[in-house]
Amino acid sequence: MGLELYLDLLSQPCRAVYIFAKKNDIPFELRIVDLIKGQHLSDAFAQVNPLKKVPALKDGDFTLTESVAILLYLTRKYKVPDYWYPQDLQARARVDEYLAWQHTTLRRSCLRALWHKVMFPVFLGEPVSPQTLAATLAELDVTLQLLEDKFLQNKAFLTGPHISLADLVAITELMHPVGAGCQVFEGRPKLATWRQRVEAAVGEDLFQEAHEVILKAKDFPPADPTIKQKLMPWVLAMIR
């Protein structure tokens, strides 16, 4: 059995892994794990990833979890352009720096924006208070400013003149609040231009394919009560 990727494109790290593999012509079998149906919580999936999270990778008898680890594994196993994860010590360190920063900052803010603005009221039927939503969106705005000031600055991409894993991970995160109807790029011309560069670099068709699900988040039907009961503890733990 060749490379298998366990993904749901509703998930932002899954989108990053999917885009990277497709863009670099890495052959893989796609194994869909439907988060909305709670398939990631099943005993069957726990055999692949006991943490019950996506993405997950299976390469023969070898399994791997965590999106950054998976992306790095793919850069090392397959012949991909150097700019994704440069050999140059300091250029690579810049990518590492962003990947270390984003997990508890941009990811948290973008995830909370999606769930508080759309997924709780629409999918789970549990509206959040206006105060909570306002605080979530304010936190997102602060994080976006940090992204611009610390990482993008006046560069073409987050870590230099070429796209890297940092940009791919960042853009897939930012499309979460976009899917919730947040005007993430409005009033931020540098960030908006950067998005256009990233989209062009990965290919517009692939970019749209990967984000088709999240851009329809507002149209999700209400969750079945049984699914809601199963998912709620997982959701609350995820966005806390």
Swiss-Prot record:
PROSITE patterns linked to this entry: GST_CTER, GST_NTER
Entries under SUPFAM superfamilies matching the protein: GST C-terminal domain-like, Thioredoxin-like
Impact upon substituting residue 176 to Q: Increases activity towards alkylhalogenides, but not hydroperoxides
Binding site for glutathione: 40, 53-54, 66-67
BP-aspect Gene Ontology terms: glutathione metabolic process
UniProt note on tissues of expression: Found in erythrocyte. Expressed at low levels in liver. In lung, expressed at low levels in club cells and ciliated cells at the alveolar/bronchiolar junction. Absent from epithelial cells of larger bronchioles.
Top-level division of the source organism's lineage: Eukaryota
Subcellular location: Cytoplasm
Catalytic function, reaction form: RX + glutathione = an S-substituted glutathione + a halide anion + H(+)
Listed GO MF terms: glutathione peroxidase activity; glutathione transferase activity
Domain GST N-terminal: 2-82
Enzyme Commission no: 2.5.1.18
Start and end residues of each GST C-terminal domain: 88-220
GO cellular component: a single term: extracellular exosome
CDD domains: GST_C_Theta (cd03183), GST_N_Theta (cd03050)
Keyword vocabulary terms for this entry: Cytoplasm, Transferase
Function: Conjugation of reduced glutathione to a wide number of exogenous and endogenous hydrophobic electrophiles. Acts on 1,2-epoxy-3-(4-nitrophenoxy)propane, phenethylisothiocyanate 4-nitrobenzyl chloride and 4-nitrophenethyl bromide. Displays glutathione peroxidase activity with cumene hydroperoxide.
Family the entry assigns: Belongs to the GST superfamily. Theta family.
Subunit field text: Homodimer.
Protein name: Glutathione S-transferase theta-1
